[in-house]
Amino acid sequence: MTVRVGVVGTGVMGADHVRTLTGGVAGARVVAVSDADQGRGRAVAAEAGDEVVFHADPVDLIGDAGVDAVVVASPDHTHEALATACVEAGKPVLCEKPLAATAADCLRIVAHEVAKGRRLVQAGYMRRFDPSYVDMKRALDAGSIGDPVLVHCVHRNARALHFFTPEMPFTSAAVHEFDVVRWLLSSEIVRVTVHRTRSSSRAAARLADPRLLVLETAAGVTVDVEVFVNAQYGYDVRCELVGELGTVSLALPSTTVVRAGGAEGVAVHADFRTRFAEAYRLQLQAWVDAAARGEACGPSAWDGYAATAVAEACLRAQEDGTPVEVELADKPALYGT
C-alpha cells in the first residue's frame, strides 16, 4: 500500500519533510501541500511533482479524500487546531514538536484522541529514532550498565535565530531532552530546577544563556541538562547514561577524522537538520509504515503533552531557582501504563 501524504507547512522543516518523503521513504507519496505563504507552498509542491496539489486552506488538505495521512509542520500556534482536525477526520498525523503551544492545548488533543478511541497522533520527537539514542536505550534495557543513577545531557546550538524568545530554550530546545529522557528511562520527570549561569556576551539581551537544568524522575534518577543556544562553534548534542555497573554515551556523529598539520579533528554539524537527518528519515519511515498498517507508533499525544508540561514547569522554576513539581493529568488507558 502506498500512503498518500499531505504536508501542512512548507518552511524549513516542512520542505525538508517533503523532500525526505519523496526521495527517502518507501511506501509514501506526497500528494498535497499547504502553506499560508502561497508562493512558497506552490514552489514546494512543484518541486515534489506535477501531480502534487496545493491547498491554500490546510483544513481543505486534511479533508481531501485523496490524502491518507498528514504531516503538520506549520507554526506552533496552529498545531492544536490542525492535529485535532486530523483526529476528527480519522487520519494519522505526524505533528512537529511542540505538539501544541501549551500543555493545556496538548491535553485537549489527548482528549479528542481518547474520544476517538484510537491513536492517530505521533509527536515529532525524532531523537527516539536516532540510531545512537536507540543503541543507548537498548544497552540500558538489556542491563548492560545496571540500573541508571544519573543522566548528563548537553544541547548546544550555534546561535539563536532572531525570533528566539526567552521561553524557547525550554519549549523549543530542551523539550527534546525532556522527551528523550522520559523515553530512555521509562519514567516521568516529576521535579525541575533551573539554575541561572553567567550569561554569554553572545546572547541577545533578552536571553539568559546558557541555562543549567536539573530534572528528577519518578524513579529517583537525577538528570542535568545544559542548554546553550549561542554556543557559536556549531550544533552539539550529547547524552551519557550512568548506571550502577557502567556508562553508555552517544557516539560522535561523524564519519571521517581529519589528521593534518599536527592535529586531529572531526567536523561539527552546523544545525540539527544535518545532525539528525537520518533520525528524521527513520521517523517518517516508521510513521508511514504504521499508517499503512492502520496503526500508530513513536511518541504519542500523551508524550507531547508530558514534554510540554515539563517545559512549562521549567518556565516557573526559572523565576527564583527553587524546585518546581511537574503536574500531570491522569494518563488515559489508551496510552498504556
From Swiss-Prot:
Catalytic activity: myo-inositol + NAD(+) = scyllo-inosose + NADH + H(+)
Recorded superkingdom: Bacteria
Catalytic EC class: oxidoreductase
Biological processes annotated in GO: inositol catabolic process
Record flagged with keyword RNA-binding: no
Pfam families in UniProt: GFO_IDH_MocA, GFO_IDH_MocA_C
GO molecular function term, any single one: inositol 2-dehydrogenase (NAD+) activity
Transmembrane segments: none
Keyword DNA repair on entry: no
SUPFAM superfamilies documented for this protein: Glyceraldehyde-3-phosphate dehydrogenase-like, C-terminal domain, NAD(P)-binding Rossmann-fold domains
EC number: 1.1.1.18
Gene3D superfamilies, per database record: Dihydrodipicolinate Reductase, domain 2 (3.30.360.10), NAD(P)-binding Rossmann-like Domain (3.40.50.720)
Keywords: NAD, Oxidoreductase
Cited PANTHER family: INOSITOL 2-DEHYDROGENASE (PTHR43593:SF1), PTHR43593
Family: Belongs to the Gfo/Idh/MocA family.
Subunit structure comment from the entry: Homotetramer.
Known function: Involved in the oxidation of myo-inositol (MI) to 2-keto-myo-inositol (2KMI or 2-inosose).
Record protein name field: Inositol 2-dehydrogenase 1
